[in-house]
Amino acid sequence: LDQACRALSPDLSRLPRQHLDIAVPTPPCPDAPHSSEEIPLTEYRSENPFGVRSDGTEPFSAQAGATSSPPRATGTLESGLLLEAFDAQLFREQSETVVAKLEKHLADLSIRGLDLTDPAILTDAARALMTTEREQVAAFDESKLAAIVDLYIKTGIQVHSPGYMGRQFSGVVPLSGVIDFVSSVVNQPSSFYEAAQLPNVAERIMAEELNAFIGWDPGSFAMVTTSGGSLANLTALLSARNHAFPGYWSEGALSLTGQLRPAIAVGDDVHYSVARAAGVMGIGDAQIVRLPLNERHQICVERARPVLDAAERQGLNVFCLVASAGTTPVGAFDPLDELAGLARERGLWLHVDGAHGASLLVSDELRHKLRGIEKVDSLTWDAHKMMFTPAPCTLLFYRNKEKSLGAFRQQASYVFDEEPDIYTALDSGEKNFECTKRPMIMPLWTLWAIHGRALFAQKIEYLCRLTGDVHRILEGEPDFETLHRPEANILCFRYRPAGLPEADVHDFQVEIRNRIKFEGNFFISKVNVDEVAALRVVMMNHQVTTEHFRMLLGEIRRVGQDLLRRTRRIS
């Protein structure tokens, strides 16, 4: 039986590669004559391994005596409104309504931050837009669609406004949003080539394009997309653990009997997703070795060595060192070249969470911030941050493509092929959590294909220069305190007017940020720096200028002085 099956199965690797023809062929006339003659299965397979006859028809069955045509559906759709919901002309009208509103939204460069709405009020507004029909399909209502889009836009953070300086997600390049719209309509889950051919090819192309800046051997590395940096970090840590402890996937913690406990080492400012990933893997907080930072908020390599030695004496087997390229609090870049040497000395897997800062690699001016990146084992890179595409779009790179298969060691015949061919070689399902995965690479690849690297490099360079400029502005303001020299586009500072008690500095910054947010003109964030709250700006919008930042400082002063007056009256 096995031999018979193999004889009947085509060797796909020997088939000619298919050429993609953009022109859509005219379908055969439905009234054309159709032969009812059945081709024997063996003859049918050998003559045409794709299972399509030369006249474009498909035999329904190869079994003797089977009917020559498939059975007809006997059910009917009772509701014309159901069919209308899928109507192409209506789709065009709906799209025009939405696009007109988005165009107006993008053209509005007024200064605004966030219209923060009471959740109960917003819930009532959303419910008021819902049909009360429960038994029948409700007719399309253009006014409801318009109201939904208006509400969606109005209640979001205004990421395209010059008042937006608060988070690490950006306003997208509009073209990338257009392609994301296409992805939503054509619905091609991209973990497997057969379901999403162009996205998988685009993923391979972008891997090669971006690896040119990382510097790994083109034939040895691998890249897979994931839905967010948190998932990428978890996947990389799983690969690192399974590499260090080969029996863990099959036998679990029992495979470690008599051994030191698995542990990871991280910088003290590492993103919380790394500790969360460790917990998911069964690595407790006591097994996370936190490495000290220097005055620039980077991992201090010299002080890290004795900490790692102490961890070993305490019964911990550190198998992975996690560094950061652009920490979330202050945007610091750990010294990757030195950490790579430390990891090599101790036989550690070196993973870099470059979710924010890896994008600096595409800039000739800023690439040096990641010196030594070619020596790391894995890298997380969020395109939805500094590559300005819709979220989520995260790229997980491995220096060794064989190790990219180490996170998950499973068999599932309904999706995984035991004998890969030229098509399944592009599948990524074996390398990541997701089976149904959005073709998130398409917006990034389209921007790269049409505009090229310079689109990203020029915007990133502008944002980093702008952050340096606003740092210099703050240095000249005696009532403001700068907390670090910016490495990229994140800057933390405090408003410290005369007469502010030291004990009140923390709460004062928190309250200023809250009031700025509620007033809705600017959107900034806050973070604890050395355990004291600070105001934080993240420059993600090229529409922001130093004049906008000076306006923000004026708002901070006004709000802060009002708080001081109120506090003094109360006291």
Which sequence ranges carry the predicted segments?
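Conserved PLP-enzyme active-site core in the AAT-like
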Residues: 198, 232-405
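Intrinsic-disorder-associated, low-complexity terminal segments enriched in Asp/Asn/His/Tyr and depleted
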Residues: 2, 11, 19-21, 34, ...
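Conserved PLP-binding catalytic core of the aspartate aminotransferase-like
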Residues: 482-516
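Active-site C-terminal subdomain of aminotransferase-like
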Residues: 327, 371-477
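Short, positively charged and aromatic/hydrophobic N-terminal segments
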Residues: 14, 18-21, 25-32, 37, ...
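N-terminal entrance/gating region of PLP-dependent enzymes' catalytic architecture
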Residues: 43, 60, 71-220, 517-518, ...
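PLP-dependent enzyme catalytic core of the Aspartate aminotransferase-like
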Residues: 50, 529-571
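Short beta-strand
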Residues: 481-486, 524-528
